[in-house]
Amino acid sequence: MLIIPAIDIYKHKVVRMETGKKEKIVLEFNNPLDLAKYWEEKGAKALHLIDLQSAIDANDESKSIVRDIVRSVSIPVEVGGGYRSREKIEEAISWGVWRVIVSSILGMELDYLLDLFSKYENKIIPSIDWYDGKVGIKGWQDFIEWRDIKRKIDLLKVREVIFTDISRDGTLKGVNLENIKNFLSLHDYDVWIAGGISSIEDVIKIKDLSENTGRIKGIIIGRALLEGKINWEEAKKIIDAS
């Protein structure tokens, strides 16, 4: 398992939004690049970088910041937020990203997806942004049925997805373990867990679930790390332990 710090960017700033709503910005500060370098110095093995302005407002104003972070750190960076076209995905890949996180394009025609994933299968990872059994797209402003997404993922032969619990994302309410278990029961993919992880106890719960299932690749944490609710060194030690 890995523990990956999350950096959300909106209008050139690092932010945290409750349940992905821009009306609910609960944390905001400058210098996203400084934060990325900080996590690299602290021993993070990868970064999870989301352009919320692109995801929510379809505005690429912050794209240059995302690009500069990818090029300025030596650890792998996965990027997401508004990657809804082949051109934009290919542009991010040209920066040297670890992988591009996609969700909205999963609603597109299967032939288009088959062509895209066949060319970039190791550079694209679907994000299943989960709310009440449906999958959020377009900055979590629209929702589509899970069964439709699963059918396409199965045909694309994807083996890893990110699971984000929208109802807990950015809330510090703690992880909903039953939601995660339920999601794992619906498929056989390996999963990266995000949304609501807010304490060392949450980290331990997911680590235990990983050991029981063998299918959790890692956890993605944002607000709890930024606010000191989770101690980075302690969490990393737990995750790194065999």
Swiss-Prot record:
GO MF, any single term: 1-(5-phosphoribosyl)-5-[(5-phosphoribosylamino)methylideneamino]imidazole-4-carboxamide isomerase activity
Keywords, in A-Z order = Amino-acid biosynthesis, Cytoplasm, Histidine biosynthesis, Isomerase
What EC number(s) does this enzyme carry?
5.3.1.16
Under catalytic activity, the entry for this protein gives: 1-(5-phospho-beta-D-ribosyl)-5-[(5-phospho-beta-D-ribosylamino)methylideneamino]imidazole-4-carboxamide = 5-[(5-phospho-1-deoxy-D-ribulos-1-ylimino)methylamino]-1-(5-phospho-beta-D-ribosyl)imidazole-4-carboxamide
GO cellular component terms, A-Z: cytoplasm
**Pathway it acts in?**
Amino-acid biosynthesis; L-histidine biosynthesis; L-histidine from 5-phospho-alpha-D-ribose 1-diphosphate: step 4/9
Superkingdom, natural source: Bacteria
| Location of this chain's protein in the cell | Cytoplasm
Could you list the residue ranges forming a coiled coil in this record?
none
Q: Which GO terms describe its biological process?
A: L-histidine biosynthetic process; L-tryptophan biosynthetic process
In the UniProt entry, which residues are flagged as the active site? Answer: D8, D129
Q: What is this protein called?
A: 1-(5-phosphoribosyl)-5-[(5-phosphoribosylamino)methylideneamino] imidazole-4-carboxamide isomerase
Q: Which organism is it from?
A: Dictyoglomus thermophilum (strain ATCC 35947 / DSM 3960 / H-6-12)
Q: Which gene encodes it?
A: hisA
